[in-house]
């Protein structure tokens, strides 16, 4: 943790500088957090809502942040947990199978006016959607966010070995999907 991050945390925890520090936090991490969430839930509006929930949790709980990890890691852990909670809540409220959830994610991707990828990018996203939830998150964090396994381990509370295995299997499944998909 560098000195500017320590200063930001101190300001977030002090009443006098809290709002200004919070604006800096939002400006610094908003884009990365949004895209991390978006890759999990696949929908712009849902990602925006979840991001707001993340900020509310951070605002309410910053005083309990123990600084065992970096601020970035703590924020990503909250964003990941909020995203997974959202998906679990969606599953509970609607009695649907995993296939139906995958179909919903595919439909969301195909009808998303904010998706700007070409056909190759779309095929990759379709392949990623087919992955089990945990593998999808690990793949996105490693491939797109270029996170180190140690960082991912802190965020996901999973061993480095398990993350490497998840990523390996995810890559194999994505490769298979891309080979099978018509060009």
Indicate residue ranges for each PLM-predicted region.
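A short pre-motif secondary-structure segment
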Residues: 138-142
